[in-house]
Protein backbone atom coordinates (compact mmCIF):
# COMPACT_ATOMS: atom_id res chain seq x y z
CA UNK A 1 0.00 0.00 0.00
CA UNK A 2 1.32 3.44 -0.89
CA UNK A 3 2.50 5.78 1.85
CA UNK A 4 -0.26 8.22 0.85
CA UNK A 5 -2.99 5.61 1.32
CA UNK A 6 -1.56 4.52 4.68
CA UNK A 7 -1.63 8.15 5.78
CA UNK A 8 -5.32 8.45 4.79
CA UNK A 9 -6.21 5.36 6.86
CA UNK A 10 -4.22 6.76 9.80
CA UNK A 11 -5.89 10.17 9.64
CA UNK A 12 -9.42 8.73 9.38
CA UNK A 13 -8.80 5.86 11.81
CA UNK A 14 -11.17 6.98 14.57
CA UNK A 15 -13.90 8.02 12.14
CA UNK A 16 -13.68 4.65 10.37
CA UNK A 17 -13.75 2.85 13.73
CA UNK A 18 -16.93 4.66 14.70
CA UNK A 19 -18.66 3.36 11.55
CA UNK A 20 -18.08 -0.30 12.58
CA UNK A 21 -17.32 -1.25 8.99
CA UNK A 22 -16.83 -4.96 9.67
CA UNK A 23 -20.49 -5.71 10.38
CA UNK A 24 -21.47 -5.92 6.69
CA UNK A 25 -19.99 -7.71 3.70
CA UNK A 26 -16.65 -5.90 3.93
CA UNK A 27 -14.65 -8.78 5.42
CA UNK A 28 -16.12 -11.35 3.03
CA UNK A 29 -15.31 -9.16 0.03
CA UNK A 30 -11.72 -8.56 1.18
CA UNK A 31 -11.31 -12.30 1.78
CA UNK A 32 -12.80 -13.18 -1.61
CA UNK A 33 -10.43 -10.74 -3.35
CA UNK A 34 -7.39 -12.22 -1.60
CA UNK A 35 -6.61 -9.15 0.51
CA UNK A 36 -7.37 -10.95 3.79
CA UNK A 37 -6.49 -14.55 4.63
CA UNK A 38 -8.82 -16.92 6.46
CA UNK A 39 -6.69 -16.39 9.58
CA UNK A 40 -7.14 -12.61 9.32
CA UNK A 41 -10.94 -12.99 9.13
CA UNK A 42 -11.00 -15.32 12.15
CA UNK A 43 -8.72 -13.01 14.12
CA UNK A 44 -10.91 -9.98 13.34
CA UNK A 45 -14.15 -11.82 14.17
CA UNK A 46 -12.65 -12.95 17.49
CA UNK A 47 -12.51 -9.32 18.69
CA UNK A 48 -15.20 -8.50 21.24
CA UNK A 49 -16.51 -5.18 19.88
CA UNK A 50 -17.21 -3.74 16.45
CA UNK A 51 -14.72 -0.94 17.11
CA UNK A 52 -11.93 -3.41 17.91
CA UNK A 53 -12.75 -5.45 14.82
CA UNK A 54 -12.52 -2.38 12.61
CA UNK A 55 -9.29 -1.21 14.27
CA UNK A 56 -7.67 -4.61 13.70
CA UNK A 57 -8.76 -4.54 10.05
CA UNK A 58 -7.15 -1.08 9.69
CA UNK A 59 -3.96 -2.44 11.28
CA UNK A 60 -3.81 -5.36 8.83
CA UNK A 61 -4.69 -3.56 5.56
CA UNK A 62 -1.47 -1.51 5.05
CA UNK A 63 0.66 -4.66 4.81
CA UNK A 64 -1.61 -6.39 2.27
CA UNK A 65 -0.04 -5.17 -0.95
CA UNK A 66 -0.58 -2.42 -3.53
CA UNK A 67 -4.23 -3.27 -4.28
CA UNK A 68 -5.39 -3.26 -0.65
CA UNK A 69 -6.63 0.35 -0.53
CA UNK A 70 -8.62 0.21 -3.79
CA UNK A 71 -10.11 -3.16 -2.87
CA UNK A 72 -11.05 -1.74 0.54
CA UNK A 73 -12.84 1.13 -1.26
CA UNK A 74 -14.68 -1.41 -3.45
CA UNK A 75 -15.72 -3.36 -0.35
CA UNK A 76 -17.57 -0.35 1.09
CA UNK A 77 -20.68 -0.77 -1.11
CA UNK A 78 -22.89 -0.55 1.99
CA UNK A 79 -21.07 2.55 3.24
CA UNK A 80 -21.04 4.97 0.27
CA UNK A 81 -20.51 8.00 2.55
CA UNK A 82 -17.38 6.40 4.04
CA UNK A 83 -16.07 5.55 0.58
CA UNK A 84 -16.54 9.16 -0.59
CA UNK A 85 -14.76 10.47 2.51
CA UNK A 86 -11.79 8.16 1.86
CA UNK A 87 -11.63 9.11 -1.83
CA UNK A 88 -11.72 12.82 -0.96
CA UNK A 89 -8.99 12.42 1.67
CA UNK A 90 -6.89 10.50 -0.84
CA UNK A 91 -7.26 13.22 -3.50
CA UNK A 92 -6.29 15.86 -0.95
CA UNK A 93 -3.26 13.79 0.05
CA UNK A 94 -2.25 13.56 -3.62
CA UNK A 95 -2.33 17.31 -4.16
CA UNK A 96 -0.55 17.84 -0.86
CA UNK A 97 2.36 15.43 -1.32
CA UNK A 98 5.50 16.61 0.46
CA UNK A 99 8.59 17.06 -1.71
CA UNK A 100 10.06 13.84 -0.33
CA UNK A 101 7.26 11.86 -1.97
CA UNK A 102 8.48 12.86 -5.39
CA UNK A 103 11.63 11.48 -6.89
CA UNK A 104 13.42 14.61 -7.97
CA UNK A 105 15.67 14.57 -10.96
CA UNK A 106 14.57 11.19 -12.32
CA UNK A 107 12.82 11.33 -15.73
CA UNK A 108 9.30 9.93 -15.80
CA UNK A 109 10.19 7.30 -18.44
CA UNK A 110 12.65 5.79 -15.94
CA UNK A 111 10.16 6.02 -13.05
CA UNK A 112 7.70 4.02 -15.15
CA UNK A 113 10.26 1.37 -16.15
CA UNK A 114 11.17 -1.85 -14.32
CA UNK A 115 14.56 -2.26 -12.63
CA UNK A 116 17.09 -4.53 -14.38
CA UNK A 117 18.78 -7.54 -12.75
CA UNK A 118 21.90 -5.43 -12.20
CA UNK A 119 19.88 -2.65 -10.51
CA UNK A 120 18.06 -5.19 -8.31
CA UNK A 121 21.47 -6.54 -7.32
CA UNK A 122 22.61 -3.05 -6.33
CA UNK A 123 19.49 -2.53 -4.23
CA UNK A 124 19.99 -5.92 -2.53
CA UNK A 125 23.52 -4.88 -1.53
CA UNK A 126 22.21 -1.76 0.20
CA UNK A 127 19.03 -3.08 1.82
CA UNK A 128 19.44 -4.52 5.30
CA UNK A 129 16.97 -6.65 7.28
CA UNK A 130 14.20 -4.22 6.21
CA UNK A 131 14.00 -6.01 2.84
CA UNK A 132 11.20 -8.23 4.17
CA UNK A 133 8.70 -5.43 5.01
CA UNK A 134 9.65 -3.74 1.71
CA UNK A 135 8.75 -6.76 -0.43
CA UNK A 136 5.58 -7.34 1.64
CA UNK A 137 4.52 -3.74 0.96
CA UNK A 138 5.13 -4.39 -2.76
CA UNK A 139 2.62 -7.26 -2.71
CA UNK A 140 4.71 -10.39 -2.09
CA UNK A 141 3.54 -12.83 0.59
CA UNK A 142 5.20 -14.42 3.61
CA UNK A 143 5.23 -17.66 1.58
CA UNK A 144 7.30 -15.93 -1.13
CA UNK A 145 9.78 -14.74 1.51
CA UNK A 146 9.96 -18.23 3.00
CA UNK A 147 10.72 -19.73 -0.43
CA UNK A 148 13.46 -17.16 -1.13
CA UNK A 149 15.05 -18.00 2.23
CA UNK A 150 14.74 -21.75 1.65
CA UNK A 151 16.33 -21.44 -1.81
CA UNK A 152 19.31 -19.45 -0.47
CA UNK A 153 19.65 -20.39 3.23
CA UNK A 154 23.19 -18.98 3.62
CA UNK A 155 23.10 -15.91 1.39
CA UNK A 156 20.86 -13.00 2.38
CA UNK A 157 21.70 -10.98 -0.73
CA UNK A 158 20.55 -13.84 -2.97
CA UNK A 159 17.29 -14.04 -0.95
CA UNK A 160 16.70 -10.33 -1.55
CA UNK A 161 17.53 -10.53 -5.26
CA UNK A 162 15.17 -13.48 -5.76
CA UNK A 163 12.37 -11.67 -3.87
CA UNK A 164 12.63 -8.58 -6.11
CA UNK A 165 12.82 -10.70 -9.25
CA UNK A 166 9.63 -12.52 -8.11
CA UNK A 167 8.00 -9.10 -7.62
CA UNK A 168 9.05 -7.99 -11.12
CA UNK A 169 7.76 -11.23 -12.71
CA UNK A 170 4.47 -11.15 -10.81
CA UNK A 171 3.57 -7.50 -11.35
CA UNK A 172 5.03 -7.07 -14.85
CA UNK A 173 4.63 -3.50 -16.08
CA UNK A 174 3.43 -2.37 -12.63
CA UNK A 175 6.81 -3.36 -11.10
CA UNK A 176 8.32 0.09 -11.69
CA UNK A 177 10.82 2.35 -9.96
CA UNK A 178 7.83 4.48 -8.91
CA UNK A 179 6.10 1.59 -7.13
CA UNK A 180 9.45 0.59 -5.60
CA UNK A 181 9.85 4.15 -4.35
CA UNK A 182 6.36 4.04 -2.82
CA UNK A 183 7.14 0.66 -1.22
CA UNK A 184 10.34 1.96 0.38
CA UNK A 185 8.56 5.03 1.75
CA UNK A 186 5.67 2.91 3.03
CA UNK A 187 8.01 1.08 5.41
CA UNK A 188 10.06 4.22 6.12
CA UNK A 189 13.21 3.15 4.27
CA UNK A 190 15.11 6.04 2.67
CA UNK A 191 13.90 6.11 -0.98
CA UNK A 192 17.16 7.79 -2.07
CA UNK A 193 18.46 4.19 -2.27
CA UNK A 194 16.90 4.20 -5.74
CA UNK A 195 19.24 6.95 -6.87
CA UNK A 196 22.21 4.64 -6.21
CA UNK A 197 20.55 1.98 -8.37
CA UNK A 198 20.43 4.44 -11.26
CA UNK A 199 24.06 5.55 -11.05
From Swiss-Prot:
Domain CARD: 1-91
Keyword Cytoplasm: yes
UniProt xrefs under PROSITE patterns: CARD, DEATH_DOMAIN
Cytoplasm keyword on record: yes
Top-level taxonomic group: Eukaryota
Gene3D superfamilies, A to Z: Death Domain, Fas
Intracellular or extracellular location(s): Cytoplasm; Nucleus
Sorted UniProt keywords: Apoptosis, Cytoplasm, Nucleus
Record-linked InterPro entries: CARD, CARD_RAIDD, CRADD, CRADD_Death, DEATH-like_dom_sf, Death_dom
Entry GO CC: cytoplasm; endopeptidase complex; nucleus
Domain called Death: residue spans: 116-188
UniProt GO molecular function: death domain binding; protease binding; protein-macromolecule adaptor activity
GO annotation (BP), single: DNA damage response, signal transduction by p53 class mediator
PANTHER family with a match to the protein in the record: DEATH DOMAIN-CONTAINING PROTEIN CRADD
Assembly mode: Forms a complex named the PIDDosome with PIDD1 and CASP2. Interacts (via Death domain) with RIPK1 (via Death domain); the interaction is direct. Interacts with TRADD. Interacts with TNFRSF1A.
Reported function: Adapter protein that associates with PIDD1 and the caspase CASP2 to form the PIDDosome, a complex that activates CASP2 and triggers apoptosis. Also recruits CASP2 to the TNFR-1 signaling complex through its interaction with RIPK1 and TRADD and may play a role in the tumor necrosis factor-mediated signaling pathway.
Domain notes: The Death domain mediates the interaction with PIDD1 and the formation of a complex composed of 5 PIDD1 and 7 CRADD proteins which in turn probably recruit 7 CASP2 to form the PIDDosome. The Death domain mediates a direct interaction with the Death domain of RIPK1. The CARD domain mediates a direct interaction with CASP2.
Name of the protein in question: Death domain-containing protein CRADD
Gene this protein is translated from: CRADD
Amino acid sequence: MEARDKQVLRLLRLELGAEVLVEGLVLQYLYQEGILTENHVQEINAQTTGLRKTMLLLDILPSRGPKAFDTFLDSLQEFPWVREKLKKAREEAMTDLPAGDRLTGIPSHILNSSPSDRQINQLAQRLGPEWEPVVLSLGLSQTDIYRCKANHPHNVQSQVVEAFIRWRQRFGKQATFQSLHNGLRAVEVDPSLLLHMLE
